[in-house]
Amino acid sequence: MIIRSPEPEVKILVDRDPVKTSFEEWARPGHFSRTIAKGPDTTTWIWNLHADAHDFDSHTSDLEEISRKVFSAHFGQLSIIFLWLSGMYFHGARFSNYEAWLSDPTHIGPSAQVVWPIVGQEILNGDVGGGFRGIQITSGFFQLWRASGITSELQLYCTAIGALVFAALMLFAGWFHYHKAAPKLAWFQDVESMLNHHLAGLLGLGSLSWAGHQVHVSLPINQFLNAGVDPKEIPLPHEFILNRDLLAQLYPSFAEGATPFFTLNWSKYADFLTFRGGLDPVTGGLWLTDIAHHHLAIAILFLIAGHMYRTNWGIGHGLKDILEAHKGPFTGQGHKGLYEILTTSWHAQLSLNLAMLGSLTIVVAHHMYSMPPYPYLATDYGTQLSLFTHHMWIGGFLIVGAAAHAAIFMVRDYDPTTRYNDLLDRVLRHRDAIISHLNWACIFLGFHSFGLYIHNDTMSALGRPQDMFSDTAIQLQPVFAQWIQNTHALAPGATAPGATASTSLTWGGGDLVAVGGKVALLPIPLGTADFLVHHIHAFTIHVTVLILLKGVLFARSSRLIPDKANLGFRFPCDGPGRGGTCQVSAWDHVFLGLFWMYNSISVVIFHFSWKMQSDVWGSVSDQGVVTHITGGNFAQSSITINGWLRDFLWAQASQVIQSYGSSLSAYGLFFLGAHFVWAFSLMFLFSGRGYWQELIESIVWAHNKLKVAPATQPRALSIIQGRAVGVTHYLLGGIATTWAFFLARIIAVG
């Protein structure tokens, strides 16, 4: 008789056919809500339909069902992303000058859009070089394609088709995992398993496969391109993968195969896994061999990290234990209870993820110019400016989203009866101290940062330059920042003995790198002007945080409205008969936070745009003399408000204002139109609902007179709807205005 250990029970983690697929139901507007499904009585119906369609919390209170809807929606989102990517690659294949750009990236601009002549719009097709006429693009796709080893438009076609297949696959997966095999709640809450798969699978194997692609395909192809070989002569990717001798000609260590790996003689691989630092002088981008090495190292770290958490085998960390062990001397119960919050409130989970992803996106913005990862990216000033601006805006929106979902968690998911003396409870109990101190910091920063500028404007107006804060009079040098720069500039040979150059040329020390007579990057000097504007950054960021954090900490209750939690996430006022209680909902804090986020990011991208044109970007003569686009005027001009208005906004707007009749005229029209969209927002923000309701009733009266009144009663927008429309147009108008201003300028002079 054989005694067996009991078989481990396999947990069934999916439900089969939980929701039937019904086109009839999908075709009924508002099928997710009993009230909305009845159809419209008033025009408010269409607003409620849009507001609640994706608010899954309002469709059901069953956490499992909500989780499944979110999970399924993620596949829909991925499908849209693949569709978008496919469109980008298709434009590269069908409408672009990619192959021409590849053969001469310093003299030919990237273009992937040719405008059809209908009523004269073909004026927009500017000459981008090499005899190609089209709209210059600034997305950085060409540089990315070159870095990944794409050498022909046929390869772009194939990738575009592949992305379409994946888009279809994702749509199918979204349907399948909601209607056919929907995961149970336990599956969504199994955090250790999720961590293992995401860390080892997505990040670990993802980085490893990218490192493999770089080593076997990108590096050899880029090696040939840098040497000036015609792209059509370069072997195709599969030839490098299948033929080891081909690679061994470029990287001798390939001849030895995996022997050095297993004999621990890893330094043999140093010909394609380097640790140089700095930029490749041919392309002005990071060394691609450094990047391959980086991805290999990252892959190893994440593969290890993906084996740290306890799943089926009973070994490893449990996240609940880690959190509950986290107790400081002053934090009471510490992180006890956080595990339950993060596994039952997807808003809390999303809030943390948005905060971290938003911060990471802003870090990406700063690395794209200081460590330009792709060949010929650094000398494409339009793309550099666009990538920085784009990632700053995205980061700002994500961080505001983090506050929004933190507040929704507080209102909908927070249970005060089970939370006592843990970290969150302690934060909430001393929220008055937090907010009043933060408010003081904002007032201090606001008066002092702005005061320095006002002082300078006044002294300048009175003709007393010797009494101004500037590099040539009263100096306020950013000594801490300069110390950090210096430390990094000295790091190679000290803290990083293998590296030949520092992580970024911007730190100082190194010479400039120029490609095709244009500056790619050089040490960025910091002075009084930067010190002043950095304190404006500190001010605007602190005010944004003040508004958002106050919204979160007072989302459930305040002295003014103790029962705020019962009123929900968004409400206009605390009912009739309680004056002075409007605009206090958590939603209103997000609304106000968006304006200050817009302020913060605007100052950052203005600072970046002017600083780079003044101190970095420009041309290099044969004698090595650098001529910057605005001739280094940042240090002396940006220290007064007047300087910002006169030498940045007005002086640099000349290109967009004078763009009519040229290939940049679309930016002139966008500049005008976006100003109009922005002004349109003020109509919603500075106007009361009653005004519009009265106006509508007069108009309805006229329709009744003529017997053309509709069955659906027109209603003025609610207060919340009006503010939502207002902030949307404010941001859309402001961002599009800035976009047109930046691009017309930098394409003309860059």
From Swiss-Prot:
One of its GO terms (molecular function) is 4 iron, 4 sulfur cluster binding. It is found in: Plastid, Chloroplast thylakoid membrane. One of its GO terms (biological process) is photosynthesis. P700 is a chlorophyll a/chlorophyll a' dimer, A0 is one or more chlorophyll a, A1 is one or both phylloquinones and FX is a shared 4Fe-4S iron-sulfur center. Keywords: 4Fe-4S, Chlorophyll, Chloroplast, Chromophore, Electron transport, Iron, Iron-sulfur, Magnesium, Membrane, Metal-binding, Oxidoreductase, Photosynthesis, Photosystem I, Plastid, Thylakoid, Transmembrane, Transmembrane helix, Transport. GO terms for cellular component: chloroplast thylakoid membrane; photosystem I. Phylloquinone binds at residue 692. InterPro entries: PSI_PsaA, PSI_PsaA/B, PSI_PsaA/B_CS, PSI_PsaA/B_sf. Its EC number is 1.97.1.12. Signal peptide: none annotated. Chlorophyll a' binds at residue 675. Its main location: plastid. PsaA and PsaB bind P700, the primary electron donor of photosystem I (PSI), as well as the electron acceptors A0, A1 and FX. PSI is a plastocyanin-ferredoxin oxidoreductase, converting photonic excitation into a charge separation, which transfers an electron from the donor P700 chlorophyll pair to the spectroscopically characterized acceptors A0, A1, FX, FA and FB in turn. Oxidized P700 is reduced on the lumenal side of the thylakoid membrane by plastocyanin. HAMAP family: PSI_PsaA (MF_00458). This is Photosystem I P700 chlorophyll a apoprotein A1. It comes from Solanum tuberosum (Potato). The gene is psaA.
